[in-house]
Regions:
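Flexible, glycine-rich terminal cap/loop adjacent to redox cofactors
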Residues: 8-12, 22-27, 35-36, 340-347, ...
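Residue-level detector of alpha-helix initiation sites
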Residues: 11-15, 37, 115-117, 141, ...
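Glycine-rich dinucleotide-binding loop and its adjacent helix/turn
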Residues: 113-177, 212, 273-275
Length: 453
């Protein structure tokens, strides 16, 4: 008898799981329920669609429901799963267009419900739909709505509430479009995973491009005019005029559905899984922004929601849901973002994070050049290494600079994945040519300075 796999959520983890499950078991009956109008799209490309760098939102879509149908993967758009009966392995599904509700049986269940934007409870003006011109950016439909609003209403002043990756990238998008842009962040720095000494370089890059930063500040209320259009953001430091507000606060795991069904959560509040992406319930899997990921540096689950992790976890989950055998080897927390010509990359632990976890550490920060000093385009690059005292074990790294930051952070990610010491890092045989690096790569310079320290 043919088994049925039901997948809740059609973005990175869900559709990676669907595709891999199909390749693992050609006979599996696969149903995907997605409450929005799109599946399998590059969510990280949305800021560039808003700015106009990417002209057509359809180019962000990797595969359409029709393409999945050719693999015999049935995708149901605008369908929301509102309940899970794990004991009977059934889900309650609501058709958001017709209003009809039905039950669907399954043999195995994948939960890929993703993350949700953190919205301050009870704060005036923050509730969805309360004021025109207030947006979040999680789904592709959000990006489309923001771009259409800008084209239709031609706002002059944008305020971004939140100073993380989305806030930073959207600040660039709004400035590219000519909007006066303010970023309000509750922490005293942008990019809170970074050490303050490194975050300041990115903050300077934004201010150089005309972005106003109000850090160590908290948005308290959004106020509108008589027609219900947002007009200002009231914060603990004052008021900021706004025609457009983007709420880019923390991403939280979307786990209410899973938790109600008895799925266990980890210490982070996201779904806990084993290395095969199995939950505590039989035949129920979870992956992506709703789930924890094993962090190789700290040796336990962490919540660092990223598309790269979601795709890898989804692939493992799909293999196992399809009857195969696969394990997720873990993350080291590698991220990168960009604003204008400055890139900020991080892997592993920042010094402040390592100390909070009880590690005794020393940090080394150096300034080098991204290319040979005489080669056109050579630019400053700041590298920070975090090393465990005594053992010399590499715990993390941060790089601020030009596009070369991305290439180098991947070297550090590999070093962390392999549990290398800073001495071993210093001995790596890295490529050299003047257009790409100095003869002493900034990573090697930083490692050698750390060894002296």
């Amino acid at each position: 008898m043919t088994e049925r796999l039901v997948i809740i959520g059609g973005c990175a983890a869900g559709m990676s799981a669907a595709s891999k499950a199909r390749r693992t078991d050609p006979d599996l009956d696969i149903l995907v329920y997605e409450k929005t109008g799109f599946v399998a799209y590059g969510a990280c490309g949305m800021p560039y669609y808003v700015s106009g760098l990417v002209q057509d939102h359809n180019t962000l879509v990797v595969r359409t429901p029709e393409q999945f149908a050719r693999q015999e993967i049935k995708v149901h758009l605008h369908h929301e799963v509102t309940g899970i009966d794990a004991a009977r392995c059934r889900v309650r599904v609501s058709d958001l267009e017709s209003g009809e509700t039905r039950e669907e049986a399954c043999d195995k269940l994948v939960i890929a419900t993703g993350g949700r934007s953190a919205i301050p409870a009870g704060a005036p003006g923050f509730s969805p739909g309360e004021l025109q011109g207030v947006f979040t950016l999680r789904a592709l439909e959000d990006g489309i709505a923001i771009r259409e609003f800008i084209q239709r209403e031609k706002p002059r002043r944008a305020v971004i509430v939140g100073a993380g990756y989305i806030g930073l990238e959207m600040a660039e998008s709004f400035r590219v479009l000519g909007l006066e842009t303010t970023v309000i962040g509750r922490p005293p720095q942008m990019l809170k995973r970074f050490d303050p000494e490194m975050a300041q370089f990115m903050q300077g890059a934004l201010e150089d491009e005309g972005v106003r930063l109000s850090l160590g500040d908290e948005a308290k209320a959004l106020e509108g005019d008589s027609q219900g259009r947002v007009r200002q953001v009231v914060s603990s430091s004052g008021a900021f005029e706004a025609d457009l507000v983007l709420l880019a606060l923390s991403v939280l795991p979307n786990v209410a559905l899973a938790e109600a069904a008895g799925v266990a959560l980890g210490e982070t509040g996201a779904i806990a899984t084993d290395a095969g992406m199995r939950t505590n319930l039989p035949n129920v899997f979870a992956a992506g922004d709703c789930a924890e990921a094993y962090h190789r540096v700290i040796g336990r689950g962490a919540y660092i929601p990223l598309g790269t992790t979601a795709n890898k976890q989804g692939r493992v989950m799909g293999t196992n849901a399809g009857g195969g055998q696969a394990t997720f080897k873990g993350i080291v927390g590698t991220t990168i973002t960009k604003a204008f010509d400055t890139y900020a990359a991080l892997t592993g632990l920042a010094e402040k994070e390592a100390r909070a976890l009880g590690y005794e550490v020393k940090s080394t920060t150096i300034k080098a050049r991204s290319r040979a000093h005489y080669y056109p385009g050579s630019a400053p690059m700041h590298v920070r290494l975090v090393v465990q005292e005594g053992s010399g074990r590499l715990l993390g790294g941060q790089i601020i600079g030009d596009e070369g930051a991305g290439l180098r952070i991947n070297v550090l990610a590999g070093a962390l994945h392999s549990d290398m010491t800073v001495e071993q890092l210093s001995q790596l045989d890295l490529a050299y040519m003047p257009p790409m690096s100095p003869v002493w790569d900034p990573l090697l310079v930083a490692a050698n300075v750390a060894l002296k320290g």
